[in-house]
From Swiss-Prot:
Broad class of the protein's primary localization: cytoplasm
GO terms assigned for molecular function: pyrroline-5-carboxylate reductase activity
Disease in which the protein is involved: Leukodystrophy, hypomyelinating, 10: An autosomal recessive neurologic disorder characterized by postnatal microcephaly, severely delayed psychomotor development, hypomyelination, and reduced cerebral white-matter volume.
Species of provenance: Homo sapiens
Compartment(s) where it occurs, according to its Swiss-Prot or TrEMBL record: Cytoplasm; Mitochondrion
PTM annotation (N-acetylserine): residues: 2
Protein name listed in UniProt: Pyrroline-5-carboxylate reductase 2
Ranges of biased composition (kind: Low complexity): 295-305
Subunit structure: Homodecamer; composed of 5 homodimers. Interacts with LTO1.
Length: 320
C-alpha cells in the first residue's frame, strides 16, 4: 500500500511522520505534492525520505490511499485537475474542513462512475501517535476501504467511524482542540511566571498537568466533574481558583469556541460551493475584507508615494 498527500503542509507532515514512527508505513511508500518546495514542512518531509513532487497528477499515479490535505476552497480545483487520473483502486480521503462527501463524489463522477470517497477529520497530535480521528464513508466506498483507513489512523491515535453530519462538530471540538490546549498552556505558563516560576519549568508543569489529567480521564469511567471534585478540598486553593474561572465564564468560552469553529467550518464549504471563485481570488477577497474591517487602515497617499497615511477609526469620537 502506498499513501499520497495532495498538499505538503502541517497535516501531511504530521500524518507522514506519525505513520512512519508507528511503523505502519515506510517513508518511500509515501508521496506528497506541493507547488512550493521551500516550505519548512516540505524540507521536513524530504529529510524523512518522503517522495516529493510539484505534480498532483504524479501523486495520484503513485498512491493507493490519497489524502486531500489542502484548504477547503482549493478542493474543487484539485478535483478538476486530478479527476481523470483517479482510478478504481484509489481511496480518496478528504481532510478539508467542511468539504462534504457528496461534493467530492459529484466532482469525481464526472470522470468515473463509482469513486471511493471517505471524509476524515483528524488533528495534529497524530505526529506523536496521539491524534483524534473520525471518518465517514461515501456512497461507493466499501467496508474494507473504511477498515483500511481506520487501520492507518488508529496507528497514530484514536479513530472511529461516525455519521457524516457529526464531522463539523468534531472539527470544532477535537480538530481545533489542540489549539485551545496550546493557548491554555501558554496562559497557565504565564500564570506560573507571574508567580515566580522560570518559563521553561512553568511550561513543563502545565503540559504535564494537562497530559496527566487527560490520561486519568481516559483510563477511568468517571465523569470529568467527578475527577475535578476529587482535586478540590473544602476551602482549599483549587476550589477558589475554580470559582474565579467560573466567574470569568470559562465554560462558556470553551463552548463558544467549539461552536465558532463548527460554524466557520460550514462557512468554508459554503464559500467553495456558492462563490465558485479561484483560490487566488478568494485570498484577495479575504485580504480586502480584512482591510475593510480593520480598525486601522494604512494606505499610500497619491501625493506622497513614499509616506504612509494611517487613518484611525475612533469610537464615539473619542481617542484611546
Amino acid at each position: 500500500m502506498s499513501v499520497g498527500f495532495i498538499g505538503a503542509g502541517q497535516l501531511a507532515y504530521a500524518l507522514a511522520r506519525g505513520f512512519t514512527a508507528a511503523g505502519i508505513l515506510s517513508a518511500h511508500k509515501i508521496i506528497a505534492s506541493s507547488p512550493e518546495m521551500n516550505l519548512p514542512t516540505v524540507s521536513a518531509l524530504r529529510k524523512m525520505g518522503v517522495n516529493l513532487t510539484r505534480s498532483n497528477k504524479e501523486t495520484v499515479k503513485h498512491s493507493d490511499v490519497l489524502f486531500l490535505a489542502v484548504k477547503p476552497h482549493i478542493i474543487p480545483f484539485i478535483l478538476d485537475e486530478i479527476g481523470a487520473d483517479v482510478q478504481a483502486r484509489h481511496i480518496v480521503v478528504s481532510c478539508a474542513a467542511g468539504v462534504t462527501i457528496s461534493s467530492v463524489e459529484k466532482k469525481l463522477m464526472a470522470f468515473q462512475p463509482a469513486p471511493k470517497v471517505i471524509r476524515c477529520m483528524t488533528n495534529t497530535p497524530v505526529v506523536v501517535q496521539e491524534g483524534a480521528t473520525v471518518y465517514a464513508t461515501g456512497t461507493h466506498a466499501l467496508v474494507e476501504d473504511g477498515q483500511l483507513l481506520e487501520q492507518l489512523m488508529s496507528s497514530v491515535g484514536f479513530c472511529t467511524e461516525v455519521e457524516e453530519d457529526l464531522i463539523d462538530a468534531v472539527t470544532g471540538l477535537s480538530g481545533s482542540g489542540p489549539a485551545y490546549a496550546f493557548m491554555a498552556l501558554d496562559a497557565l505558563a504565564d500564570g506560573g511566571v507571574k508567580m515566580g516560576l522560570p518559563r521553561r519549568l512553568a511550561i513543563q508543569l502545565g503540559a504535564q498537568a494537562l497530559l496527566g489529567a487527560a490520561k486519568m480521564l481516559l483510563d477511568s469511567e468517571q465523569h470529568p466533574c467527578q475527577l475535578k471534585d476529587n482535586v478540590c478540598s473544602p476551602g482549599g486553593a483549587t476550589i477558589h481558583a475554580l470559582h474565579f474561572l467560573e466567574s470569568g465564564g470559562f465554560r462558556s468560552l470553551l463552548i463558544n469556541a467549539v461552536e465558532a469553529s463548527c460554524i466557520r467550518t460550514r462557512e468554508l464549504q459554503s464559500m467553495a460551493d456558492q462563490e465558485k471563485i479561484s483560490p487566488a481570488a478568494l485570498k484577495k477577497t479575504l485580504l480586502d475584507r480584512v482591510k475593510l474591517e480593520s480598525p486601522t487602515v494604512s494606505t499610500l497617499t497619491p501625493s506622497s508615494p513614499g509616506k504612509l497615511l494611517t487613518r484611525s477609526l475612533a469610537l464615539g469620537g473619542k481617542k484611546d
